[in-house]
């Protein structure tokens, strides 16, 4: 009783009692002491560190894109390469903006939507680039058609024992990647709509939350796309060997799928209580948003190393050496703006999707034809296999392939 009385009517001569009492009552529940670890995401240090890696990655990649557009000597190949390279600026800058505004549950979802849509675009372009390297569908089929599919548990072909490669196999690979280009944007739009109605929260696996169903659909779609890429690489790895496909394949796969599995790991950690929420008088952020903030910070750092690796994997120097044609003449070069415009034109993707998903699919492809009379210099052939395939695309005619079994 005396203690409570002293607290209500403090003695002016004892200031310690007066100062101690308000300090206890003024400390809100969920004070900064409860968020010592995650508060790093809100500091200037986190923004500066992530910003340094992001802007450095942007400079490296934008210079590489500029050089590809300047040496735009193989449009059919470089169109897909430039599209793939754009994943670094989009991923890096988008993640950095999400990190800057991660305390708002709305903003980071919208930023992530743009990033998610583009990653599906990259998978398709990587497969299309491999097609271009090998001269198109008909050139690939002339090499692998009728060959038995080797059974391998590593590449997931153990269930295909006894089957042979057919045009249906290539169609399946294209369809499996194209479906991801459709499913991913649809899931991104669904996420925005569910978020607006309060039915979506990162890391919430409750049956009433849209996060559970979006994650399941996305998992199925991305697994199918990845499986198709593995199958195609398994079938053509020897043909692709002159183009260093392992590094290219690893980089594209890691940039896209590593970020996904990082997000899944953070969601599991959040569910286990390893990621606390931020709850203070100034701001209140749920565990799912904090996990998304960590994901954005990690991506910002990773994009710097991705930019360095992609610079080596998709070097422009190969195309700078191809400015001279077989006759030693300077190949006509387009302006950088027109090359960029051609690169960003999605007409080829739309046409490919219509062709591969059309019920009237006739199993036709573009057959490349080589000009006769190869040039010999000093007793050695002057054109490599890659030059021959590239030059072959200059003269194309439509060839109707005979129908065979679907894959």
Swiss-Prot record:
Membrane topology note: Multi-pass membrane protein
Positions bearing Phosphoserine: 388, 402-403
Keywords: Membrane, Phosphoprotein, Transmembrane, Transmembrane helix
Primary location recorded for the protein, binned into one broad class: membrane
GO CC, one annotated term: membrane
Disulfide cysteine pairs (residue numbers): none
Biased composition (Low complexity): 1-28
Pfam families recorded: Solute_trans_a
Start and end residues of each stretch annotated as Disordered: 1-31, 369-395
Coiled-coil residues: none
Compartments reported by the entry: Membrane
Record's keyword annotation contains Transmembrane helix: yes
Domain of life the protein comes from: Eukaryota
InterPro entries named in the record: Ostalpha/TMEM184C (IPR005178)
Segments crossing the lipid bilayer: 40-60, 84-104, 121-141, 178-198, 214-234, 249-269, 290-310
Presence of the UniProt keyword Transmembrane in the record: yes
The family this protein is said to belong to: Belongs to the TMEM184 family.
Free-text function comment from the UniProt entry: May activate the MAP kinase signaling pathway.
Protein's recorded name: Transmembrane protein 184B
Organism this protein belongs to: Mus musculus (Mouse)
Higher taxonomy: Eukaryota, Metazoa, Chordata, Craniata, Vertebrata
Originating gene: Tmem184b
């Amino acid at each position: 009783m005396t203690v409570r009385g002293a607290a209500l009517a403090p003695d002016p001569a004892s200031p310690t009692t007066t100062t101690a009492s308000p300090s206890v009552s003024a400390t809100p529940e969920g004070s900064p002491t409860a968020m010592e670890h995650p508060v790093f995401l809100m500091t200037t240090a986190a923004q500066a560190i992530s910003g340094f890696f992001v802007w450095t990655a942007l400079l490296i990649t934008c210079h590489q894109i500029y050089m590809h557009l300047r040496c735009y000597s193989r449009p059919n190949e470089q169109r897909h390469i430039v599209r793939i390279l754009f994943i670094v600026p989009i991923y890096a800058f988008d993640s950095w903006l999400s990190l800057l505004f991660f305390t708002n549950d709305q903003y980071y979802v919208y930023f992530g939507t743009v990033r998610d849509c583009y990653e599906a675009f990259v998978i398709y372009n990587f497969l299309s680039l491999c097609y271009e390297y090998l001269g198109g569908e008909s050139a690939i089929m002339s090499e692998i058609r009728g060959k038995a599919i080797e059974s391998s548990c590593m590449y997931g072909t153990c269930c295909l024992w006894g089957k042979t490669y057919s045009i249906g196999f290539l169609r399946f690979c294209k369809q499996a990647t194209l479906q991801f280009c459709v499913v991913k944007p649809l899931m991104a739009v669904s996420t925005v709509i569910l978020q607006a109605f309060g039915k979506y929260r990162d890391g919430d696996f409750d049956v009433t939350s849209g996060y559970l169903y979006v994650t399941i659909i996305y998992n199925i779609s991305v697994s199918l796309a990845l499986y198709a890429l593995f199958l195609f690489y398994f079938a053509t790895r020897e043909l692709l060997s002159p183009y260093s496909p392992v590094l290219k394949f690893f980089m594209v796969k890691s940039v896209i799928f590593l970020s996904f599995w990082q997000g899944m790991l953070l969601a599991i950690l959040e569910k286990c209580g390893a990621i606390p929420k931020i709850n203070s008088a100034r701001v209140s952020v749920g565990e799912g948003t904090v996990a998304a903030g960590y994901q954005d910070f990690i991506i910002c750092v990773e994009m710097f190393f991705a930019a360095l690796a992609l610079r080596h994997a998709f070097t422009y120097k190969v195309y700078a050496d191809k400015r001279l044609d077989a006759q030693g003449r300077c190949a006509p070069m387009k302006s950088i703006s027109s090359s960029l415009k051609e690169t960003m034109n999605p007409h080829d993707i739309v046409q490919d999707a219509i062709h591969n998903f059309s019920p009237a699919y006739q199993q036709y492809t573009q057959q490349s034809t080589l000009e006769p009379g190869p040039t010999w210099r000093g007793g050695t052939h002057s054109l490599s296999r890659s030059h021959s395939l590239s030059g072959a695309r200059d003269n194309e005619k439509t060839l109707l392939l005979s129908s065979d079994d679907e894959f």
